Amino acid sequence: MQNLLLALPNELQAQVIAPLPIHTILTLRLVSKSFHTLITLNEASIARYHATNSLPAYALRLYPLPDPTAINLHYLCSIWHRLHVATKLSIMISAQATKEIFLRTTDALRLEFEPQHRRMRQRLVPLIFALFHFFETYRDLHVRHLATGGTPIHLQPFTLNPIECQVMAMYDDRTLLKVHQVFPLVMSSFSRRLRPPSYAGRVERSFKGYLKDRPADEVYATIISVGGLRQAQRFWETKGYNSRRAAVDTWYGFVTRSPVESPPKSKMSIITHLGRKKPNAAVDATTSETTAGHNSTSCNEWFCVKPACKNGRRRHSTDNLVFHSSLSAGPPMSPLPRDQLRLILPDQQHLSNIWCHSAEALILERKIVERAQDIKRTHQVLLELIRDDGTDGLDDWSAGNTADPGQTVNTEGQEGMDAPGGVSD
């Protein structure tokens, strides 16, 4: 079969491969070097086909197609990565709301509530996707502003955050209002995941093993502003409250710690270390990573920045298409280098100032609603999310899609979206 496909002309090869699901195409890259080269050489036509036929309209509005000569698999997989994160978070937020807000705690009650749960999950996806775009774009603009010598945000006398306003100017009135209304629900759901139940007293916390309180506000702000919604999803999926809190503390310590600089050597150090065996730095680094539970051979991250994985990539040849794919650019909101972290961390906003003040002011300025009281609160948003109005809640978001208007894009069931080794892994 492989020989028959590879014997076809290039145009026919592209037409055969392009309609395949994106996960299948990515798996074919691993079959052999010939298939990898075939897909790499035809990735522009593959990406154009999927952008036209499988991407939802709201994704293309926030991430427009690049120049036809620049479109590639990285653009396509980056959007599927964002959709995957939005879908995962919508599933987890809906499950939490079903259990803790709507009090559907038994299998029978959950089965009865399933239609409302499905509508809530589907309607949350485009809104959380827009939030992913906001945090990603804000971080990029913030880093660029500070790297070019701009005045830090916390030193500017502003009423509205200028970078937030610049990002929100990309959203139409309906998107801005809907995302603003759902933002408190997303943040409160994530906050609930990282703290013990509010009803649990000190004795009950000790009995159930809730050893730590909720993280500080600056930790939450750093997670969503620096790590993004993908990092929030990682913490959310960690099983066990103490394990989640330990993962948060480990990540926050890794992000905020300063690199240890070795002290300058004195003249006596030559005599002192004379005859001693010099330790191997590479072995020490590998040992420390193994001790910390990180192994480069079993790492499943798309673009891991741990030292062992980076050293493993450097050993590969530089004249081979296998190691010069567009996907080597990494996923959206990949970890920042240390020099950019030093710029952005001291300039973080307080958690209560992120999004809310600027969005509400712009909503009133654009006259999307007449009064601030007309903006729906969380309980009203939840009722709207589960309301049965005869649609799945995605019709309004599909306007302007380049695909067939009758086509429904299912990001939850897309092959490779939920399977291990999928697009975002």
Task: Identify the role of each PLM range.
Residues L6, Q13, F102-T106, P157-E164, ...:
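A generic structural signal for ordered alpha-helices
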